């Protein structure tokens, strides 16, 4: 018997205040980058097939895995830069994005020169370590009066895109070769660098619960919802 590794769906139910008939479910899949390694056929990695029929795609970029970012951030105090083996593994994030493009277009039976309309949110993770690099005062919170301000989303995305073009242009090129609708988002689940801890003689790094302050982690999903189910999410007037 052949057992294949498949991503499990995360299902969330949304209730609309307008009542029955407007409720919906959101289904998320979390794919590892290894699922999109070049040379692996769809038959060998069937867990990637759903991506071609998804209503939206999220791509999480890890700056600490990138040699370009590591050079720019040399001397940063984040302990993740000093972990054993950190920086020695091959950074394939641009290759994974390129392979994602190939898989999606093959499964949709479209030309490699065509682009899909499906929105892609490119999330720049661990953005708290990039605040000095990004001129963080230019990055604004895009939710105003319980509405998503698309103008702010656009401006934030332009700042991130410009930065990525300088630091890792292949991510931008490969993302925009796949979709007509790509936006870039700064996110950080912890909002601060983890700290070194020792437990039972073993050394670890972990976030400090007292310092947890997530950065814009909900914004990519709000933007995606605006495209997938626009009636569920009000946007600021004039956008």
Predicted ranges, named:
Residues 1-3:
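Short, small-residue-biased leader/transition segments that mark boundaries at the very start
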Residues 6-56, 66-72:
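Switch II of P-loop NTPase G domains
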Residues 27-30, 57, 119-126, 181-188:
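Extended hydrophobic secondary-structure segments that form protein cores and membrane-embedded regions
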Residues 85, 100, 104, 202-209, ...:
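Extended recognition/assembly regions associated with phosphoester-bond processing machinery
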Residues 185, 233-234:
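Structural and coupling elements of P-loop NTPases
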Residues 231, 238-239:
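Long, low-complexity intrinsically disordered regions
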